Design a protein with these regions (language model features):
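Flexible inter-repeat linkers and adjacent short helices
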Residues: 1-76, 80
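Residue at a conserved register position within TPR or TPR-like alpha-solenoid repeats
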Residues: 23, 67-68, 110, 117, ...
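Helix-turn-helix repeat elements of alpha-solenoid scaffolds
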Residues: 24-44, 71-92, 118-131, 159-169, ...
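Long, low-complexity regulatory tails in eukaryotic proteins
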Residues: 165, 169-239
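Flexible helix-coil transition and linker loops at the boundaries of alpha-helical arrays
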Residues: 41-54, 70, 85-103, 133-141, ...
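Residue register of alpha-helical TPR repeats
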Residues: 55-58, 101, 108, 146, ...
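Structural motif corresponding to the intra-repeat A-B loop/turn of tetratricopeptide repeats
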Residues: 26, 70-71, 120, 151, ...
């Protein structure tokens, strides 16, 4: 009976986590307070230290996302992420991060740290952390294509288009292999832009697939943004 109770609670945690990731994939940040409230309610019924740590890390991740996306408080957002990793790795810092082994949750947070560092000052540190994440993550984990996408974008910002293409392709391969279509639209967008900048004729096929998967996933706002940005930034007419 106790094991069944614990499995049910972990299942509830996973459902909240999956809802969160789904909202992030769709750029739906306005209602993250729902997941935040559900996690805090779950926390009040928990006594297992490991599980409490997991919940608190996810709470801090959500708080970080809200600070960044809703209030544009990037430094405070970064502070929340560092605090989250320190729950399980108390001596963690951006200078010694390579010294530790990380859980999937911690790698997810570390990836967001790299993204925020990229946004705040765009140094080589953000690329270095993202490369560490891709080398560390299990290539069969759901986190893998997210890191591929973000690494592709980071390389794009550095005008390293062949690397941007490489990691968008790796992310697409994962999604195809595991039949996980969330994020395929974004990966095909990165692939298409990299191909365009490299002078490859296949870029339009990739961008059309991006639009196709936006529609399959009912992400019409993202579809329209892709079409607008392609025209505005690259003079590419998709539709």
């Amino acid at each position: 009976r106790w094991e069944c109770y614990r499995l049910n609670k972990y299942s509830s945690f996973e459902k909240i986590k999956n809802r969160l990731e789904s909202k992030i994939d769709r750029d739906e940040y306005q209602t993250l307070s729902v997941e935040l409230g559900d996690l805090k309610a779950l926390l009040n019924t928990e006594s297992n230290t490991h599980f409490i740590n997991l919940i608190n890390q996810l709470i801090l991740l959500i708080e970080s996302i809200i600070l960044n996306k809703k209030y544009s408080k990037t430094n405070e957002s970064l502070g929340k992420l560092i605090e989250a990793i320190k729950i399980t790795t108390p001596t963690f810092s951006l200078d010694n991060y390579k010294n530790f082994a990380y859980s999937s949750m911690e790698l997810r947070i570390l990836m967001d740290i790299a993204l925020l560092d990229n946004k705040i000052k765009f140094t080589e540190k953000s690329l270095e952390i993202m490369e560490f994440c891709i080398k560390t993550v299990d290539p069969n984990e759901e986190l893998y294509p997210k890191i591929c996408y973000n690494l592709s974008y980071t390389y794009h910002r550095l005008d390293m288009d062949k690397n941007a293409l490489k990691y968008s392709n790796l992310g697409i391969e994962y999604c195809t292999k595991h039949r996980n279509y969330n994020g395929l639209n974004l990966l095909y967008f990165r692939k298409g832009i990299a191909e365009y900048l490299l002078g490859y004729k296949t870029y339009m096929d990739s961008l059309e697939k991006c639009i196709h998967f936006c529609e399959i996933l009912s992400q019409y706002k993202l579809r329209d943004m892709v079409i607008t940005n392609c025209k505005k930034l690259y003079d590419i007419d998709i539709c």
